[in-house]
Structures are given as structure tokens and as C-alpha cells.
Amino acid sequence: MVKTVYVTGYKSFELNIFKDDAPEVHYLKQFIKHKIEQLLDEGLEWVLIQGQMGIELWTAEVVIELQRTYDSLKFAVITPFQGHTEKWNEHNQSKYANIIKHADYVDSIFHTSYQGPFQFKQADQFMLEHSDQTLLIYDEEQEASPKFFKQMLVDFMDKTNYTCDIVTFDELTAFINDLQWSEDQSF
């Protein structure tokens, strides 16, 4: 049974998404919602993110929406270090602040500012050790920052009984096609 899931994947700019109202955001959020609802049916209690723009913040927005129906669902934002949003623009900082306001738990792995890439690696390791499953939205055909986490995830799974759901673009495309078809049928 999966009680705690870590959701991660591409940053928004890695998907060439630069606006919250881009159609891709709608479909990605619907996909994330679908995946989380499946886990909720199996006993999911917590969703963990590190607070990165893109898949992680969209996941937080989905969880906030789902909490209206599933009041036992909780989410945590556990950042690698403090002040990780300082270089973000005002809009993204405001969006992040709103998400933090709704989070059930907020902390940082390192209670310092950025000191080096080791902080990201330690945060990734923490997430693996404190969750039952990872939902990773990543396709090897479009390499980007999640490739480092994916390698750590594969190594971790080899040593433990940890499970993951690695979502490829093919799975996303199939879901989006089905969703678009059902939306077209409802008119």
C-alpha cells in the first residue's frame, strides 16, 4: 500500500511551458490528478514535493484542489535548502507562497542558503527514504534535469523494495488523447 508518494519531473521551462494558462498545463494537471486519485483509492495519505516549478508545483495545485473532496489528503513541501525561490520572478514567488500557505508541512533539508549541488542530491535521497513510491514524469527521449534523479531512483530500487511509476510521453499522450476525446463528446 502506498501511503506517501513523491511526485517530481520536468521543470516548466524544460517542457517549453512559460505561462500558467498554457493548454499543456491543463492536461498535465488532469493527468497528475488522475494518478493521485488512483493512489487515493489505494490508501494514499501524503504527497511530497520539493517545490520546483513545473510538475511539482502543478502537483501541489492539484492536491489543494483534491483536498476539497479528500480531506484526509495531505501534502508536504520539503525544499533542498532555504530561499530556493529567491531568483524567481514575482509571479512565480507569489504562486509558490500561495502553495506554501496551503501545505500541511513545510521544511528544508538544509537550513542554509544554496551551498552546492550536493544539497539537491541529499534532498532526492531524503524523498526516496521518506516515501513509498515515486511518480516521475520523465521520458528519456527528452533528457533534462530529472535524468539525475531517475538514475538515483533506479539505484535505490535495486537495493530496496521501493516502487515507482515512470511516466513517458507516450503514456501522457494517450491520456491526453482520451481526455480530449471525452471533452469533445461532452459538448
Swiss-Prot record:
<dbReference type="Pfam" id="PF06908">
    <property type="entry name" value="YpsA"/>
</dbReference>
<protein>
    <recommendedName>
        <fullName>UPF0398 protein SAOUHSC_01463</fullName>
    </recommendedName>
</protein>
<dbReference type="InterPro" id="IPR010697">
    <property type="entry name" value="YspA"/>
</dbReference>
<comment type="similarity">
    <text>Belongs to the UPF0398 family.</text>
</comment>
